[in-house]
A protein has these predicted regions:
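Conserved beta-strand scaffold positions in the cores of enzyme catalytic domains, especially
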Residues: 38, 71, 132-134, 245-248
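The start of beta-strands in P-loop NTPase/AAA+ ATPase cores
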Residues: 37-38, 68-70, 165, 221
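Hydrophobic positions on the alpha1 helix immediately C-terminal to the Walker A/P-loop
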Residues: 52
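C-terminal lobe/tail of nucleotide-utilizing enzymes
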Residues: 2-24, 211-289
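P-loop/Walker-type NTP enzyme "switch/lid" segment
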Residues: 76-158, 260
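Short gly/ser/thr-rich secondary-structure transition/capping motifs
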Residues: 21-24, 114-119, 170-173, 206
Length: 289
């Protein structure tokens, strides 16, 4: 796979093609663009990450200080797409499969053509709406570890991200997938918990991983409690795990009904208690990050 070779230079990424000629584009990271805000949402499966991200999309899209908003569904299950009522035409996983097919075809011309138009192919996966743009990562047919292909795609995604003022990422339970496939660093990490003991253990694991991988400093690690019943205390965290709590979202029958019916959560009224809670959470986040 010749086109998987790279020559790294500060701020620049070169994709080395079979004929030895590098295809160049800028390599961007969150740290290089202090005016852009990158928010990632993680947590144990089933705690409501996608619902929170959908309502955050709704809230951010109606703020005057958000700027251009990009929403990335980085969970292979595409739960956020469903919560937003979106059917992705293309996914980054599809682009990855196309890259792998070209690399294994043995055709130097196919490899070169894919590498040269990679940024354009990734851009074509973007879906633009009135209030935001949407990008789906999806699930690749080939589950093998191809680090160089992942690096290629991450470079192209980071090139795309630079044109947005705010990026919201719905991730899987862990952090490594966001770091490996989407962007090298985030500004704010929101961990979602339903208050259960299992969710608390996931919060603790993510807290430890954030420090180990240097993905986000602890002062940028936030916690949101979802589906909270009045008077019920969430499970306690380890004494050394001290995320900033942004707020809690109440158990809401209207949101549950929307979810069961497959209706986009962005159609919830601004008077809905869950949306009002998320609107407050977004305001709180922007004040503290």
């Amino acid at each position: 796979m010749n086109f998987h070779d790279f020559r790294r230079h500060p701020g620049v990424c070169f994709h080395v093609l079979p004929d030895g000629q590098p295809h160049e584009h800028g390599h961007f990271s969150a740290a290089a663009h202090p005016g852009r805000r990158v928010i990632a949402v993680c947590g144990k499966g089933g705690v409501g990450k996608s619902a929170l991200c959908a309502l955050m999309t709704h809230a951010l899209a109606h703020r005057t200080d958000t700027g251009r908003l990009l929403v990335i569904d980085a969970d292979p299950a595409l739960g956020l797409a469903l919560a937003l009522g979106i059917e992705p035409r293309h996914t980054i996983a599809g682009v990855r499969d196309e890259l792998l097919a070209a690399a294994t075809s043995g055709s130097a011309q196919a490899e070169q053509e894919i590498a040269q138009k990679l940024d354009y192919i990734v851009f074509e996966s973007l879906m633009e709406y009135e209030d935001y743009a949407f990008l789906a990562m999806g699930r690749s047919r080939d589950l093998g570890c191809y680090c160089s292909v992942n690096d290629l795609l991450r470079d192209a995604i980071e090139l795309l991200i630079k044109d947005f003022d705010c990026v919201l990422i719905d991730g899987e339970a862990g952090l490594e997938q966001i770091n490996r496939q989407v962007i090298a660093a985030v500004d704010s990490l929101i961990c979602v918990s339903d208050g259960s003991a299992r969710a608390a253990r996931t919060v603790e694991t993510l807290w430890d991983m954030a420090a180990e991988n240097s993905l986000v400093p602890h002062h940028s690690f936030f916690l949101v409690f979802n589906r909270q019943e009045e008077g019920v205390e969430p499970a306690a965290l380890r004494s050394d795990v001290t995320p900033h709590v942004l707020g809690s979202i109440p158990q809401d029958p209207e949101l549950t009904a929307f979810d069961k019916a497959g209706r986009p959560l962005t159609e919830l009224s601004h008077n809905n208690p869950a949306f009002q809670a998320v609107n407050h959470i977004v305001a709180h986040l922007l004040e503290h990050s």
